[in-house]
Amino acid sequence: MSEKESPSPQHKKDEVVDDTEQETKDSEDDATKKMKIKEGSKFTMNSILSPLESLARVQQQLLKMAAAQSGFGGNGSGGNGANGFPYPARFATNCFSGPFPGYNGSQNWYNGNDARFAAAAALLPCAIDPVRSAINHQFSMSQRRKRRVLFSQAQVYELERRFKQAKYLTAPEREQLANSIRLTPTQVKIWFQNHRYKCKRQEKEKAMSGLGHGDDGCSPPPGDDDDDDDKYSIEMDDKDDEEEDGAKPMLKSNGVFGLPYPSPANAAAAAAAAAFNFQFGAQGPNPAYFMRW
């Protein structure tokens, strides 16, 4: 029976070398795959730090060149400090006078052709210019405000004639009058409000001057060139809606709770009547009054 041949030391050494080379190749393949995965992703540390690193290298080169040209050490040549770094330049602005390829050449940095910057630039003048925005706001406010409509002479004549007949119109009467003179019911309604206000103001002025009241047509005094009746004003409040839809309103007194202000004679008469009613009353003498005695 023949004995198995034992492997020689050289053969064992070759096998160990082959295993080591295979492991090295496997590790290199794994590292290459990882680097490809990292380079393919957009948000890796290399993709973020690569522009900064290139910028730092460019700045360092510029600093070295400036220190070599205008440094403090040697005969005009750049010297090194205690830590081995070059001395700073005399004029720091020379270091940053040239363009930075990290910003211009790299695609990772945004440039002016980006669509988002174009949209922001389109909105920027209106946002930072207060004068222009104020003018635009003023124009929009003036455009939204309604203009006053001028009435024709025939329309004013018909409105005044109807106002002499009745100072308050119901909704059907207002609509009928508006259709006859080619106006809207709202214009007729506000014209009546303005005309009533004008009549009250003129009556108050006449009462203060002692001239008395005018006629029902509220004719203006001589020299009064007020043209409020010839205009449709939207600034008046829409009051007297219920009064126009119903009958003529009752005159309002100036007293508290709708009562007139008491005079001394009226106060004495009211006190005497109250005392008499307490003593006797409507049904006879009041027992509570006589129980006091």
Curated annotation (Swiss-Prot):
Q: Check the record and name the Pfam families matching this protein.
A: Homeodomain
DNA-binding region extent: 144-203
Which stretches are tagged as biased composition: Basic and acidic residues? 1-15, 22-38
Question: What GO terms in the biological process aspect are recorded for it?
Answer: cell differentiation; nervous system development; regulation of transcription by RNA polymerase II
**Mainly resides where?**
nucleus
Q: Read off the InterPro entries from this record.
A: HD (IPR001356), HD_metazoa (IPR020479), Homeobox_CS (IPR017970), Homeobox_NK-like (IPR050394), Homeodomain-like_sf (IPR009057)
- Tissue expression as described in the entry: Expressed in the 8 vulval muscles, 8-10 ventral neurons in the head and in the most posterior pharyngeal muscle cell, m8.
Location within or outside the cell: Nucleus
User: Which Gene3D superfamilies does the record cross-reference, listed alphabetically?
Assistant: Homeodomain-like
Write out the entry's keywords from A to Z.
Developmental protein, DNA-binding, Homeobox, Neurogenesis, Nucleus, Transcription, Transcription regulation
Q: Name one GO cellular component term.
A: nucleus
What are the coiled-coil residue ranges?
none
Instruction: Give yes or no: UniProt keyword Lipid metabolism.
Output: no
Q: Name one GO molecular function term.
A: RNA polymerase II cis-regulatory region sequence-specific DNA binding
Give me the ranges of the annotated region Disordered.
1-38, 203-256
Q: What is the role of this chain?
A: Probable transcriptional regulator that is required in neural development for the normal formation of sublateral cholinergic motor neuron processes. Plays a role in regulating the expression of acetylcholine transporter protein unc-17 in the sublateral processes. In particular, it is required in sublateral motor neurons for a left-right turning behavior that occurs during the lethargus phase of the normal sleep process called 'flipping'. During 'flipping' animals rotate 180 degrees about their longitudinal axis.
Q: What is this protein called?
A: Homeobox protein ceh-24
**Which organism does this sequence originate in?**
Caenorhabditis briggsae
